[in-house]
Each structure stands twice: as structure tokens, then as C-alpha cells.
Amino acid sequence: LKRIGIISDTHGTFDEPLREFLKDVDEIWHAGDIGSLETADRIAAFKPLRAVTGNVDGGLIRRAYTDFLAFDCEGVRVLMTHIGGYPRHYDPRALARIHQVEPRLFVCGHSHILRVMYDPIYSLLAVNPGAAGNYGIHKVRTAIRLVIDGEEMRDMEVGEWPRSSL
């Protein structure tokens, strides 16, 4: 059994509300636009981190992380990228990887809009945790927690906070 925290689009923010929401997870998965290598290092010092690069992440982050990450968590095949889209509207690069990897859980970010959808065509759960940072179009900051127990994904929770005035 693993407790997972899923975040995206921090754009340099990893503050107390986010840490409090993620304090009991076993791993944090970051779907890109981390903001800086220093932010990634702060997250990784807090909990084990799996991350991908986002479209605004610079060269240092690109040397440390990749655009796509495929891995197994418990009995669930996971594919994570930044610009992924959602069922019936996938980004073409993401769709090619979905065909290749055949994930049961597809994690992406970029839109700053929290969205969780089951895709019956590819038999996967598509998860976008929205934006956990302060930069962007979103009105509230969001993140997701869930439990992966063997092949079962369950107990999904959404964290929601106001944007900082800083």
C-alpha cells in the first residue's frame, strides 16, 4: 500500500499548506512546471519525488528530469507527463506514449485545471491535479492524494487553497 501525493505547476511554490496536505504520503509525483531545481530539491528533501519537466522548466531541471516518466507503483502502471490533455483530447505525443506504455493511471498537468476522468477507450484513470502554485490563471491552488493498494486506486482526496497574495 502506498499513499501518493500528486502535484503540478508549482512554479517555485512549496509552502506550508502544501506540505501539510502531503505530510502523510509515501511519495510525491510532480507533473511538471516545478519552477526551479531548488524547488525540486526542497520537495525531494520532504518526501521521495518522481517528477517530469514542464514547458517553462529550464535547463537545470531538464538535465535532472525527463518529459515522460513510466513506472509501476504497487500493481499499477503509471505514465506521467506535463502536457497530456485528457480523454478524447490527448496531446498527440502523450497519446503515442499511452499506446506504448498502456498505463492504468495517466498523470499530467499544464492546464492549471483539476480534472479526474476515467477513459474507457484506454482503460485508464486520467488525473490532472491542477496547479499547486500561485502563478497562472487558476483561482484556487489544488493537489491530489490517493492510495494505491496492489492494483486498486482508491481514497482520492483533493486539497484546495486560496492563492497567496504575495
Could you describe each region identified by the protein language model?
Residues 3-9, 77-83, 124-130, 155-158:
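Active-site-proximal beta-strand elements of phosphoester/diester hydrolases
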Residues 10-12, 82, 87-91, 95:
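Short, motif-level signal for alpha-helix interfacial/capping segments enriched in acidic residues
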